[in-house]
Amino acid sequence: MDNNPNINECIPYNCLSNPEVEVLGGERIETGYTPIDISLSLTQFLLSEFVPGAGFVLGLVDIIWEIFSVLSSDAFLVQIEQLINQRIEEFARNQAISRLEGLSNLYQIYAESFREWEADPTNPALREEMRIQFNDMNSALTTAIPLFAVQNYQVPLLSVYVTCNYIISSESVMCGQRSGFDAATINSRYNDLTRLIGNYTDHAVRWYNTGLERVWGPDSRDWIRYNQFRRELTLTVLDIVSLFPNYDSRTYPIRTVSQLTREIYTNPVLENFDGSFRGSAQGIEGSIRSPHLMDILNSITIYTDAHRGEYYWSGHQIMASPVGFSGPEFTFPLYGTMGNSAPQQRIVAQLGQGVYRTLSSTLYRRPFNIGINNQQLSVLDGTEFAYGTSSNLPSAVYRKSGTVDSLDEIPPQNNNVPPRQGFSHRLSHVSMFRSGFSNSSVSIIRAPMFSWIHRSAEFNNIIPSSQITQIPLTKSTNLGSGTSVVKGPGFTGGDILRRTSPGQISTLRVNITAPLSQRYRVRILYASTTNLQFHTSIDGRPINQGNFSATMSSGRNLQSGSLRTVGFTTPFNFSNGSSVFTLSAHVFNSGNEVYIDRIEFVPAEVTFEAEYDLERAQKAVNELFTSSNQIGLKTDVTDYHIDQVSNLVECLSDEFCLDEKKELSEKVKHAKRLSDERNLLQDPNFRGINRQLDRGWRRSTDITTQGGDDFFQENYVTLLGTLMGFPSIYIKKWWFEIKSLYPLPIRGYIEDSQDLEIYLIRYNAKHETVNVPGTVPYGRFQPQVPIGKCAHHSHHFSLDIDVGCTDLNEDLGVWVIFKIKTQDGHARLGNLEFLEEKPLVGEALARVKRAEKKWRDKREKLEWETNIVYKEAKESVDALFVNSQYDRLQADTNIAMIHAADKRVHSIREA
């Protein structure tokens, strides 16, 4: 069978008349490496290889390049166009293809630079080139993604939209700290990633549901298209979306294994089924199982009937076991009828890795001609069941093999090996749609309905020691009384459990392959309309108990933001290799809704970045204050430092520690208020420059003010040297705003500077020239600034001046000046503070008194000298005029006398 050259041809549209050439509006479109092939390959890679590290990254680069090749070839657009019968307008199509080609070219350049850097990761030039190409690629994708959500074309462009989102998410995982990006950039990208994952997910699910509703109709032909849309968009959209959360490397820092438990359905294996059965869509859909716990298909007992010499599959019974074979085998009710025209035949499904393929033979006859519907016989007269295995395990055959191949609808995930090894799904259940005369035991239609589950949903709940294991709770052995299985929201990879009253949720049989000494911690992915308490136990032994918050409002639909991952901090170990894990929900009022998607078992030795970040943030916040009651700030805590602690808190994971994050955020806001209260500057954030003549900041015209960025949360100023003067900004603090006999420091943060001069002036001038190497270049300036003897090795600066007695009559004040005196100078600074420290005492006080006396003596001498010069100048001016009104010159006044008087006036000193 595997030697057949046609077996590997995966035709995704078996409802089309010619599988080799698809015809859409007169246009010939060749099939080949289809979106389904790409998506299945991608899903396999993410499920089997998703672990941080170079191997994952390099494999991802290859897959992304293949994705771009298919995206830009129009295939993803054609796929959904055919399913929903909506052709994208030519301008929108051409625009999308053009953008995809541009992104493809950009990605090719980036991928090459990434490979070169990966081969020589210590080479700074290669790393910088890779970073440049990454930023270009990231910016282009970020800009392009909203353009693939075109109004009126959200559904046709859905696969393109989701796949591009996948690419940008994976790139954020690829390029982290080891690529040389600073912590602020990494945190910014992480925050963007976690936010965008939710946006992408909700967009994809919303428009998937919109498209699904659009293709629904009453007849069998409509159901075929409906089912194909559901199946193919599950493979190309929903499966990938369900794995988006694993990109959060702070929550999943090691290899993480997920499982897809949703089921998809091949079309009923009947001839002429897509066009002849009116009003049957609802009945066909009703033949599919409602949401249920996953079970393991053990066997199918098939019954045979005959009509006018034609033998066919008339009915069957299913034998199945719970996951992990953890309970007795159970039998489903009979599907169809128990025909006896031939001996019943039992197909054993649990050989190898289960049934991965069916090859069916259809039988179509029109033995009746009754009424306007022209009744027909449409049945199945044989099926071959092929087993997934690494060896040539013989197939099981009911009567005979056929040509209708399930792989045409659900291709393998790996086309580089035989389908029996590279298959993507296995048979999970068989139901039946039947229709016929009400007064006859012979049905017109006997249509077995094959259900398929992804191969990642393994038979046993295996928990190893070296990975995070995600187990959907639909793999439970038993449900607690009051727990039900409900349809999943589309982004969880399967159905979920629901409770509306306190009690046991479910029991889960798990098999431990690690030594029993291995310790684990449990996490739960849940949504709830109420605060509640989760309890866990193993083999009846209580393990964990914890209180958790509501995540959604009553009456709201489940969205990605409704689900939250929470965990217990206390580790535990299993006592037996095969154990029963029990989860319960308590301490909430009946009538609320609690949804549980999965349980995660995490090796206890794994240090989560989220936990480390929380501990670091808690320590940083507590160290801002002088005591645990947060009454006052420590003197050495700067305004800039508070902003950085705020960034630290902002980067905490909402899923892991939302309540702690809110509490820490309030403490940081309180610290910021205390910082503002002690700051004597009227305008520390440069919001009112040049607004008041007598107070506030004054600046020259070539100084700019910018808003917050990765370095400054609030406004900062930029000074650039020019040919036309020296840019400066200054402020004066008046006497009545300053306490006597206090040291007065000015401090702040300089992101980078060259030839920045800082002056602090009262009795005398404190002056410092500051060079601080920065990280971001200014246009023509190079990012590397040579560090000389006058360079600051810290971005923080502080100058202080001692304030003596403040005198109403003197109005001396304190001047703060920042200035650039060279053409190539520049500076970027913010978070300025003017503080009052402890009163001066002892020698410091005596030193200030001496400086103050020296300044007063000098001032008195200057005043005495100035008065003498003033009197002489006034006498010279008075002698020029005939009266004190200075409106008429003396008759003998000449130009020499006027120049002499002017010279004396200009010799007067300004006090």
UniProtKB/Swiss-Prot annotation:
CDD domains: delta_endotoxin_C. Signal peptide: none annotated. It comes from the Bacteria. GO terms for molecular function: signaling receptor binding; toxin activity. Keywords: Plasmid, Sporulation, Toxin, Virulence. Pfam families: Cry1Ac_D5 (PF17997), Endotoxin_C (PF03944), Endotoxin_C2 (PF18449), Endotoxin_M (PF00555), Endotoxin_N (PF03945). SUPFAM superfamilies: delta-Endotoxin (insectocide), middle domain, delta-Endotoxin (insectocide), N-terminal domain, Galactose-binding domain-like. GO terms for biological process: sporulation resulting in formation of a cellular spore; symbiont-mediated killing of host cell. InterPro entries: Cry_V, Galactose-bd-like_sf, Pest_crys_Cry1Aa_dom-IV, Pest_crys_dom-III, Pest_crys_dom_I, Pest_crys_N_sf, Pest_cryst_cen_dom_sf, Pest_cryst_dom_II. Toxic segment of the protein is located in the N-terminus. Promotes colloidosmotic lysis by binding to the midgut epithelial cells of both dipteran and lepidopteran larvae. Belongs to the delta endotoxin family. This is Pesticidal crystal protein Cry1Af. It comes from Bacillus thuringiensis. The lineage of its organism: Bacteria, Bacillati, Bacillota, Bacilli, Bacillales. The gene is cry1Af.
